[in-house]
Amino acid sequence: MKNNLPIIDLFVSIQGEGKRAGHPSLFIRVSGCNLRCYFSGSICDTPYSSYNNEKSKFDIADVLSIIDDNPQVEDIVITGGEPLLYQAGVLELIHAIDDRLPNKHYITIETNGSIALEGEGCDLMTWVDLWSISPKLQNSIAPVGTKIEVLGKTVEFTEDVVNRLNEKRKNIDAISEIVVYGRDYQLKFVYSDENTITYIDELLGEIRTVLHDEYKYVPDFNSHVMLMPEGITEEQLQSKRQSAVNECIKKGWMYTDRLHITIWGDKRGY
């Protein structure tokens, strides 16, 4: 794992998704991701942290400065990109935050769940309050031959690229470890259409098998699985909301919206 921590966004807003939706939060976004997501013609909503990685703009001192300026904000969200590419760096950051805000912080790590904790990164289990896991399903990979323009660059999904992404996009063992040992977690899925439910059921079945066979653990997913409508505009979200809610009611899962898009649109830094 890489030890540096390329922070490219640093801002205070509200959490727009998941169990902590509505909480004032300090967002720390790192650059770099091991996946390249593509949903029904739209791509990752932060391509500057995945498709075309920006260089680091901030350091830990900048994070602490914003904390000093906003002592009322206790939720800290470490997002990306994929933060678990930088486990040692994330741990160093959390230690610094804890020194500045002892016992007054709530740490969320947003991850795609495809990278296992290793080495000193395993200590993150001690510090992270909420693991926000967004597993990438079959509907997150572009069809072979797709070409898209992203931030001035042409990205082509060749057969080799698609195969590699499909191999990397899920890590059942890594997710299962968080389910068992993490303080709290949420499995947050982007809802595209009815096929999404089939894919989720398949993934949950794989996780249940590992939990049963390796940990003798029977999970209650209903209080942890969340559906979120696909979209990066209010119009796109609205077109998926009712179907997503209906599926949540059928399955006993939770629904989460994307409040930041409803309020600010797909603007960076909100």
Residue ranges and their predicted role:
Residues 1-25:
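Short, charged low-complexity linear segments at domain edges
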Residues 5-8, 24-25, 35, 39-129:
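Conserved Radical SAM active-site core
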Residues 18, 52-55, 141, 268:
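Solvent-exposed, flexible loop/coil residues
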Residues 18-21, 38-41, 268:
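Short, glycine/acidic-enriched capping/hinge loops at junctions between secondary-structure elements
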Residues 85-270:
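Conserved AdoMet/S-adenosylmethionine-binding subsite of the radical SAM
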